[in-house]
């Protein structure tokens, strides 16, 4: 995916680096695969703010994405490439030969007209999905399941991927984008190839208004608050706030927050 840097004609254009969206071939979402999405403004059922700095933004329709890839043995053709406001990558609209339509995340290297297949065991071509036990070692994969049949959980955002580094009869070991090495069941599904739009990390909004279009409100710094509101607040004049901490007093730079008693820790080989 290509990005463009705008000329500094105005203040809002000076730092703007945005996507060109040249690849998109269909403007409106498929009606049978999209549903309405109600905005909460970060409030719960009693009207109290539970998620700060969230609200406003453009209306969105939620696209139903096929993360399970459980339509085995039936080939599909990539018919359209679409924008999805709910995620950082683009999505493909698939037409199966039996007439069904489904959305999947876009895969790097695929284009309109390519054929893909899901099965327990199939060829290692880009976009194909199969059990991890049948994927060769060293293969770049994405949309990895943690529980068989539940749908992809890992490596789903723009530019992300995992790598298969070891296999046994029951488990397979994968290296995640964070560098973590983790065991997953061999019967979990995974897609061959990495997620498209690796340039997403280079994008810059350039102005506050673009953040508001996306539904994100201004965030107040902790050091600008009073001591009653934040551990880093208060002090005479401008102060550093001391050791960086979040609103609950937990150190914010490099502090491990994962529960040490979590039962799934035994599947993590290296953090």
From Swiss-Prot:
UniProt cross-references to InterPro entries, sorted A to Z: NA-bd_OB-fold, Rib_uL2_dom2, Ribosomal_uL2, Ribosomal_uL2_bac/org-type, Ribosomal_uL2_C, Ribosomal_uL2_CS, Ribosomal_uL2_dom3, Ribosomal_uL2_RNA-bd_dom
Protein's name according to its UniProt entry: Large ribosomal subunit protein uL2
A single BP term in Gene Ontology: cytoplasmic translation
Basic residues bias spans: 257-271
Subunit and interaction comment: Part of the 50S ribosomal subunit. Forms a bridge to the 30S subunit in the 70S ribosome.
Keywords assigned by UniProt, alphabetized: Ribonucleoprotein, Ribosomal protein, RNA-binding, rRNA-binding
Upper classification of the organism: Bacteria, Pseudomonadati, Bacteroidota, Flavobacteriia, Flavobacteriales
Keyword Transmembrane set for record: no
Annotated spans, Disordered: 221-271
